[in-house]
Amino acid sequence: MTNTTVLNKAADNIRILAASIVEKAKSGHPGGAMGGADFVNTLFAEFLVYDPSDPKWINRDRFFLDPGHMSPMLYSVLALTGKFTLDELKQFRQWGSPTPGHPEVDVMRGIENTSGPLGQGHTMAVGAAIAERFLVARFGDWMAHKTYAFISDGGIQEEISQGAGRIAGYLGLSLIHISEPTRLQLIS
């Protein structure tokens, strides 16, 4: 199998897991999670620098999920890396579950931020990139790492997100934003 074939199959597994856990919970948003599967799989498989045996490694790259309702995508890719079990995924959105509807920070399991209101994850990513800039200035290039953020078109519309984006651009931060614009808000 080619590397592309493996990546595509892994992304399909993320889609299947994401849709399955939302269906089992009878609650959640499967669309965004399924749409972001290719991105998150490629990020974790090809670009994100981290040490699974040392989740708090100071030089790890950071990934911030702004739209918390896309948590099925994050939980699914983390399950493929061994951070969540299938039984834990089946508890999605249940009271006291390790997989709530919006992720809560748990660096040991690969979750860098608690996702709440849209724009919050975006601003946390900007803050992490500012911290990375400080660490490099203070301790040297060996502290350099990348910060990634997945932001939604709805999140970009939030003023807090717009302000964070302006600051990030002004400071020229080592920050990579990924957005999958649907040009569509939640429809009922």
Segments from the language model and where they lie:
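N-terminal capping segment at the start of a domain
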Residues: 11-27, 179
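Active-site phosphate/pyrophosphate-handling residues
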Residues: 17, 38, 185
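Short coil/turn segments at secondary-structure junctions
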Residues: 2, 23-24, 111-112
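Basic/polar N-terminal segments that are highly enriched at the extreme N-terminus
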Residues: 1-8
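Conserved phosphate/pyrophosphate-binding and hydrolysis machinery centered on Walker-type P-loop NTPases
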Residues: 30-33
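Single conserved hydrophobic/aromatic residue that forms the stacking wall/gate
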Residues: 176-188
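Cofactor-binding active-site loop characterized by glycine-rich and histidine/acidic residues
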Residues: 35-171
